[in-house]
Amino acid sequence: HTRALVNKAFSRPVIAKYEELIRELASEILDKAFEEEEFDAVERIARQLPMRMLARIIGVPDADSDWLVAKGDELIANTDPNYTDFVVDQVDTNEFRLMPFRSPAGKDLFEYADKHLSRIRERGEEENILSMILQPTKEGTVMIESDSQNFFCLLVAAGNDTARYSIASSIK
């Protein structure tokens, strides 16, 4: 049932609507990076672009983008003390056993998702990827709250991991 809810939101016509927004964001990030004579392209471009783009297409306020990037790092790099204070193989993770990646970042993202998704449901008129996913299918199927929170975390994890490393590996 989840696939039917997600397919429409990530269809080519829907994503095409974000092309200009994505171009503007990419230009903004590149312009800021190129202000410096030298910079770490992975940090300044590959780390920033996917999460900031994701934030915009799912309706997360720009003011929360830095937080989302940091939580994405904590979630995915949960074995690296450079990215998280909660290194999973060095601490008791039982408290977070039901959270993505057994991480407190998963809990933080669940709580954020709950508030963000509630705002989207209350407003009802927003046009973004998450608002589309929250809409019932033709058959009346809706994504339940826990699935919505998990999906939000999945988007953060995928945006932070797959897209970042794809961009990083393409930079020469």
Language model regions located:
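Cytochrome P450 catalytic core segment centered on helix I
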Residues: 29, 70-141
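Amphipathic, well-packed alpha-helical segments that form the structural scaffold of globular domains
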Residues: 3, 7, 11, 23-31, ...
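Secondary-structure capping and boundary motifs in well-ordered enzyme cores
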Residues: 18, 42-47, 105, 140, ...
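Hydrophobic mid-domain F-helix/FG-region of cytochrome P450s
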Residues: 4-5, 26-64, 72-81, 114-117
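Cytochrome P450 catalytic-core helices
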Residues: 130, 147-156, 160-172
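Amphipathic alpha-helical interaction segments
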Residues: 21-24, 48-53, 67-70, 128, ...
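Cytochrome P450
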Residues: 1-4, 15-24, 35-52, 60-67, 88-111
